[in-house]
């Protein structure tokens, strides 16, 4: 196990629906522990992209990344849950720890709050055992498969998953005379606390039950069915725990578990549909196939093996969520707590304050088949709870983070043509923007959010987020011919100007008297007790992605704007003892470890200096992303941190939250080919590309000279090739006024 195992590759003939069981390599660990490993076909290596994924990236530091078995956008994230020791265990796992409390079926990835961990199994030596030691050297993980060798008890644990079901296999050592596990419905991760649980059905080879809980998501409901490959005896222990005793320890015990947020009957149907048989290796192979299919939507060429591994790991991480939140029969539990029948796939785990910036614009490039269902999810959430999602989890609105982040995502889908019910989408956006809660009433009354009237603080961050969301509403209103609405929301989108102090050149808290808050220190950050959200004035002054040219004018002219922007990457200062740990990945005061900074590097293109963006983009990719468990500069944030890398590595980034204007940066890949579907591809080719040749010298789009430092979404969707000639010195490319975004 100390040697890195060869990665699984699914042969092309499997894609032709011939699905043989791949060669099982017997790997003897301690004398008698088989390990599922698959033969690596060198001839197929180029199409086996899972071999380039390192799931451990981000499992240390502040990455908070999930480690375990799942499939793209699945409801199930089956993996180890460790004994929580603090904030860095939000996913239930951290590289620094070695104490397991169970193998749970649901985990979050990259969040700043811990949740889930539902329906856990743990092999034990006796009924009172609640923790098991393990060694990271005895783990084996790849997309869709997790395994670990435990010593006490002496058992080899293997896990895989489908969208709505988990599959376990436990192989007990020859010295194990009493094979047993604990089924734990009490334990949860972080804020999660059970409110009701029970085994509602107990049979010789199956149990079924429910687990309801509260926490970050206030009203969580999970129903489950667990089937065993051999007879077991189930005995109640203390609260929420049952002892599962295995009849024959000489045979592996397999457990199939189906989950549903609706009912036991639906959990059973999910399980029977997705894992009808007991062929563990086939499910592992199907998971690998699912990952390869999604990873292949972007094929990159590079001589840098580390960059390739970081790229495909980022792709892998970007597909943990949104998570499917409807059953195979179409039923789902809505935001109103009721069961609904849908004609679309419903989703949850919507970390929108993070993901509207890059993860969702990335989805519009590579997951177009999902977009109508994502839009339907948003519209139905609005109809069920009266507003678009803010941070939705397990069908619950958590209201976590500031602003109206559901608006940019839905507006982008409307403007890019993926929403059939445009009027319904617009109504959801408009009414979400016109509410009274979360500071919106103050915005309507004063035209901004005065710090002395909002008890929840963070008024600058809220106000800037509302302004960019209002701009998105205005764009959709304009598209639909709603002139009065377009005018109203376009004016409200300019409210960001209220927070700008021309004397200091920063966005600042402002009171009802029209005066800025004093005293003022642009470096200071007091978590949840000042005018900013997980940041300071240096970081929030640039949060005007919808109107960069308007922001430039506030500084007086382009030169003053550039001078200030240059300073961002140089200045250092004391943020104070109460700064948020999310302020990380610093280059000067630029904080790549947190989302509000993510568009800032690309602002140089707006003022005709794309070479400065290129230098900083390369620096950020090289310094903030590593092929290591501590390889992220901050929380993964449900795919946003990875999505920034994916887009930037290809040379693209959508700064404006909605509309499809992708800024051209400095691709780290020599070639990236995006599969658009319908047999069309869009390729970005970098000629003469290297670690020194980071500046675009010239460009061609489909063979014709291209001078703009941005490209529109609809132009990419036609298919074709963007060819960039790179060099080691800044050039005049993209600098003319007509060529700027």
What residues fall within each predicted segment?
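Bacterial Sec-dependent N-terminal signal peptides
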Residues: 11-44
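Single conserved hydrophobic/aromatic residue that forms the stacking wall/gate
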Residues: 1-12
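Extracellular attachment/recognition segments
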Residues: 695
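ATP-dependent phospho-/nucleotidyl transfer catalytic cores
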Residues: 469
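Accessory carbohydrate-recognition regions in carbohydrate-active enzymes
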Residues: 39-408, 412-464, 472, 477-498, ...
């Amino acid at each position: 196990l100390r040697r890195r195992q060869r990665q699984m590759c699914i042969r092309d003939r499997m894609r032709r629906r011939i699905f043989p069981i791949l060669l099982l390599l017997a790997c003897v660990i301690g004398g008698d522990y088989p390990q599922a490993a698959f033969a690596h076909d060198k001839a197929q290596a180029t199409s086996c992209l899972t071999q380039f994924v390192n799931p451990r990236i981000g499992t240390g530091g502040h990455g908070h990344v999930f480690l375990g078995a799942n499939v793209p956008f699945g409801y199930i994230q089956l993996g180890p849950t460790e004994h929580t020791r603090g904030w860095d265990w939000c996913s239930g796992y951290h590289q620094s720890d070695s104490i397991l409390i169970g193998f749970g079926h649901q985990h979050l990835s990259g969040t700043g709050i811990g949740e889930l961990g539902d329906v856990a199994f743990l092999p034990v030596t006796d009924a009172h055992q609640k923790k098991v030691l393990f060694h990271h050297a005895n783990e084996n993980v790849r997309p869709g498969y997790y395994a670990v060798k435990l010593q006490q008890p002496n058992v080899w644990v293997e896990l895989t998953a489908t969208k709505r079901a988990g599959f376990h296999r436990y192989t007990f050592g020859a010295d194990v005379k009493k094979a047993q596990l604990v089924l734990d419905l009490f334990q949860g991760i972080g804020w999660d606390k059970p409110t009701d649980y029970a085994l509602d059905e107990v049979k010789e080879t199956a149990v079924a039950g429910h687990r309801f809980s509260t926490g970050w998501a206030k009203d969580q409901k999970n129903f489950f069915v667990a089937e065993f490959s051999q007879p077991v005896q189930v005995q109640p222990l203390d609260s929420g725990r049952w002892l599962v005793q295995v009849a024959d320890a000489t045979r592996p015990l397999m457990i199939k578990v189906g989950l549903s947020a609706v009912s036991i009957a639906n959990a059973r149907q999910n399980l029977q549909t997705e894992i009808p048989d007991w062929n563990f290796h086939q499910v592992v192979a199907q998971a690998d196939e699912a990952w390869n299919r999604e990873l292949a939507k972007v094929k990159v060429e590079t001589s840098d093996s580390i960059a390739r591994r970081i790229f495909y790991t980022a792709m892998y991480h970007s597909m943990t969520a949104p998570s499917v939140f409807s059953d195979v029969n179409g039923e789902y539990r809505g935001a109103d707590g009721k069961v609904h029948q849908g004609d679309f796939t419903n989703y949850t785990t919507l970390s929108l304050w993070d993901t509207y910036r890059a993860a969702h614009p990335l989805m519009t490039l590579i997951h177009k088949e999902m977009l109508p269902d994502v839009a339907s999810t948003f519209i139905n959430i609005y109809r069920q709870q009266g507003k678009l999602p803010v941070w939705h989890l397990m069908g619950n609105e958590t209201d976590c983070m500031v602003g109206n982040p559901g608006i940019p995502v839905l507006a982008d889908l409307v403007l890019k043509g993926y929403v059939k019910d445009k009027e319904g989408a617009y109504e959801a956006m408009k009414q979400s923007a016109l509410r009274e809660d979360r500071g919106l009433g103050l915005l309507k009354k004063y035209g901004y959010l005065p710090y002395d009237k909002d008890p929840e603080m963070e008024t600058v961050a809220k106000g800037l987020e509302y302004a960019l969301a209002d701009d998105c509403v205005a764009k959709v209103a304009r598209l639909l011919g709603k002139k009065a609405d377009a005018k109203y929301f376009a004016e409200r989108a300019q409210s960001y100007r209220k927070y700008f102090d021309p004397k200091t050149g920063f966005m600042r808290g402002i009171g009802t008297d029209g005066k800025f808050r004093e005293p003022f220190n642009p470096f200071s950050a007091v978590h949840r007790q000042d005018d900013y959200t997980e940041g300071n004035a240096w970081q929030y002054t640039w949060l005007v992605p919808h109107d960069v040219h308007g922001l430039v004018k506030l500084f007086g002219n382009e030169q003053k704007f550039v001078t200030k922007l240059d300073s961002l990457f140089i200045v250092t200062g004391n943020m104070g003892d109460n700064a948020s740990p999310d302020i990380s990945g610093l280059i000067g005061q630029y904080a790549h470890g947190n989302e509000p900074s993510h568009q800032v590097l690309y602002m140089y293109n707006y003022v005709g200096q794309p070479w400065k963006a290129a230098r900083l983009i390369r620096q950020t990719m090289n310094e903030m992303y590593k092929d290591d468990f501590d390889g992220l500069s901050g929380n993964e944030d449900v795919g946003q941190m990875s999505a920034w890398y994916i887009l930037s590595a290809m040379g693209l980034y959508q700064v404006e939250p909605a509309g499809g204007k992708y800024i051209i940066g400095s691709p780290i890949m020599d070639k990236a080919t995006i599969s658009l579907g319908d047999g069309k591809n869009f390729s970005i080719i970098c000629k003469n590309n290297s670690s020194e040749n980071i500046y675009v010298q010239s460009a061609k789009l489909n063979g014709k000279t291209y001078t703009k430092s941005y490209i529109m979404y609809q132009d990419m969707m036609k298919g074709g090739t963007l060819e960039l000639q790179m060099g080691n010195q800044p050039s005049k490319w993209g600098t003319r006024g007509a060529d700027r975004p």
